[in-house]
Regions:
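Fe(II)/2-oxoglutarate oxygenase catalytic core
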Residues: 2-257, 261-290
């Protein structure tokens, strides 16, 4: 199947035109897309897709096992109300409400800098978000390239950061970013708290990237609170400089695939409530960070 690939930015990302994955895709094509995604620095948009939920899941599994798969762990209980009722592998993002009054998805999902599910021992690798209904204006998603941010640091700073570990904790976001009535207290236990290298290495190409984020990182292991906060705030400000960013303006049918191991993202919630928005996301379980 022929398709066209173009760069999204000078530094990272690719966009693909001319594919109709809903008409079927071979294992070879799916693996080619995985390879192209890795080569693009972990950010790829495939335009004009009409995938069913089942096809979305099938494609996502070529990237790895999914949260919600049989014999795999689900996402945290707090977001269970946003999981697709027929497909536990799909997390829904939406400002719409069903006829029974239940939300069709999370309205204000990801409106802060974060890396998906970084608080698990095996955090998210790829996230595959399919835009099914999109407002005419607004709702962009911004990505920050943490591999480029790491490379831009001085050798001295890299030497300081390389041996450090940081703690990631769902409670960091739950206490501020989620409406308190929907927090499930079970999510505050050890299953949603993990210690990871502050600088992680991708096994596919041995590239290094910063692996901390304001949404879920609580502190750096072994440092006092003031020291930890000073380093983290420096890294956060450094890593969202304009040269590391890509801002995606959504079109209906976009399938956006990003690598949580080397990218942070931020959802801009600037669209009106009366403009419907509905998206479905599959989230791939990654390796234990090293």
């Amino acid at each position: 199947m022929d398709y066209e690939t173009r760069p999204l930015t000078q530094g990272f990302g690719a966009e693909i035109f001319g594919l109709d994955l809903a008409s079927g895709f071979s294992d070879n094509l799916a693996q080619d897309l995985v390879g192209a995604w890795v080569d693009a620095g972990g950010l790829m948009v495939i335009h004009d897709q009409t995938l069913s939920s089942e096809q979305h899941i099938a494609l996502s599994r070529h990237f790895g096992p999914l949260f919600g798969d049989p014999n795999e762990s689900p996402l945290q209980d707090t977001v269970s109300r946003y999981i697709h009722p027929d497909h536990p592998e799909i997390y829904r993002v939406s400002n719409q409400v069903s006829t029974d009054g239940k939300p069709k998805g999370r309205k204000g999902a990801g409106t802060y800098w974060h890396s998906d599910v970084s608080f698990r021992d095996r955090p998210a690798q790829a996230s595959l978000l399919h835009a099914k209904t999109i407002p005419p204006v607004g709702g962009d998603t911004i990505f920050a390239d943490q591999a480029a941010a790491y490379e831009a640091l001085s050798d001295g700073m890299k030497a300081i950061l390389d041996p450090l570990y940081a703690w990631h904790d769902f409670e960091v976001a739950a206490r501020t970013q989620y409406a308190k009535p929907v927090i499930v207290e079970n999510d505050m236990d050890g299953a949603n708290r993990a210690r990871h290298p502050l600088v992680r290495t991708k096994p596919e190409n041995n590239s290094k990237s910063l692996f901390v984020n304001p949404g879920f990182t609580s502190h750096i292991d072994g440092l006092d609170a003031a020291e930890s906060q000073a380093i983290l705030e420096f890294l956060y400000q450094h890593s969202i400089q304009p040269q590391f960013l890509y801002r995606h303006r959504w079109n209906e049918g976009d399938l956006l695939i990003w690598d949580n191991r080397s990218l942070m993202h931020f959802a801009v919630m600037d669209y009106p409530d009366d403009e419907p928005r509905y998206m479905e996301r599959c989230t791939v379980i990654g390796e234990i960070p090293t």
